[in-house]
Amino acid sequence: MTATISLATLFGEARSQNGWLDRDVPDARLREIYDQMKFGPTSVNCSPARIVFVRSMEAKQKLAGAVAPANVDKVMNAPVVAIVGYDTRFYDRLPELFPHNPAVKSWFEGPEKAAFAETTAFRNGTLQGAYLIMAARAVGLDCGPMSGFNNAAVDAAFFAGTTIRSNFICGLGHGDPGRVFPRSPRLAFEQACTLA
């Protein structure tokens, strides 16, 4: 990716999508998204995000069975739906990902540290999910993030027998501008921020 990306592309002009054009998203584009998002910062480079790119009809039907009724159409019609998950055992990879501190794995290991590890995985996996959205927009795709689904059902369908848990799902493709709602208001700086 060599193009200069504007803030408007990433934020101001980008919209959450409700419908999709019939345009393919090649595997190479998904790899490009990951190869950019992986460089976003995470705590001790823990990189807990695990992503399933759902694109086959069979996999979409499996996912559609676990989403809220309002999201079924969005799942079935998106060229790709990313299931953004996080690995609660992310720390098993820390010797590889954070090699300058040999003790780093011990910060998260053991039953007494399970809550800390879970919080770390969820927080940093969420960050990486946001990086996925920014990377997808940067390479010219639109996004439709969704949280209206049954996490336990998605985990059973896609992550059974693993230590990965679902966080949110996100349609990826070329959005149908006719299906986008008018932009909703946002909070002003003074409403959301404090200078201390």
From Swiss-Prot:
It is an enzyme of class 1 (oxidoreductase). Its EC number is 1.-.-.-. Transmembrane segments: none annotated. The keyword Flavoprotein applies. Its cofactor is FMN. Keywords: Flavoprotein, FMN, NAD, NADP, Oxidoreductase. InterPro entries: Nitroreductase, Nitroreductase-like, Nitroreductase_HadB/RutE, RutE-like. The keyword Chaperone does not apply. Disulfide bonds: none annotated. GO terms for molecular function: oxidoreductase activity. NCBIfam families: PRK05365.1. Belongs to the nitroreductase family. HadB/RutE subfamily. HAMAP family: Oxidoreductase_RutE_HadB (MF_01204). This is Putative NADH dehydrogenase/NAD(P)H nitroreductase HadB. It comes from Ralstonia pickettii (Burkholderia pickettii).
